[in-house]
Amino acid sequence: MSRMTYFSADEVNEICDRMRSEHYPCDVIHLDTGWFRTDWLCEWKFNEERFPDPKGFIQRLKKNGYRVSLWQLPYVAENAEQIGEAKANDYIAPLTRQQDTDGSNFSALDYAGTIDFTYPKATEWYKGLLKQLLDVGVTCIKTDFGENIHMDAVYKGMKPELLNNLYALLYQKAAYEITKEVTGDGIVWARAAWAGCQRYPLHWGGDSCSSWDGMAGSLKGGLHFGLSGFAFWSHDVPGFHTLPNFMNSIVSDDVYMRWTQFGLFTSHILY
């Protein structure tokens, strides 16, 4: 169960308690972009005011039958806490020129740099960021993005033209390995993919439109994905964004019900 987005432990607990009281089957609660100090500012740390006791918060949810998944991405923002360390140690690939951005948060170009998974020290640094979260009880990391990188940058082990497609594989491998090391279960919640990513399940379609066309596209994409060797795949039910208002239009009951029926036949279902 997810939404865009939960902003506090109290909000999450209220939703989770209500699902149990109404006998709604759910075993994973996913926190998207709002669990940081600032929404979308990925620093791999809980907001201390809105989530004052992360370990206690997660333990309470586990006692209630929920595992916790957290959103993050493989880029470091200019105003992130880790930016100085990341730049000084080349954990993010140095840019050869400044790139234009529209400030949308939806592209690598909206961030100061891409974590360089061709550089073993950067990979271990990234794993350390995730380990701190897994150690307090987080079960799964959402490896969002990864489908594009900064192309005007110098990566330690590969030219960006070669790395661009392979990046998702290296990114998900790192998250999968540290998750399995800490929790014993190898799992991520990934969006991008390339040949070999089936070794690091699972993947979901990501951000489709809440419409009949959006549902049809998710079905067609998922069928092709399965034929490409991916045993596990999922999608947002009933889509992610709406029309004409991107986040605030009402999804029709017919689309909601039919998409739920479709979702039950995929390996994992995400509301």
Region annotations inferred by a language model:
Residues M1-Y271:
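Catalytic-domain carbohydrate-binding cleft regions of carbohydrate-active enzymes
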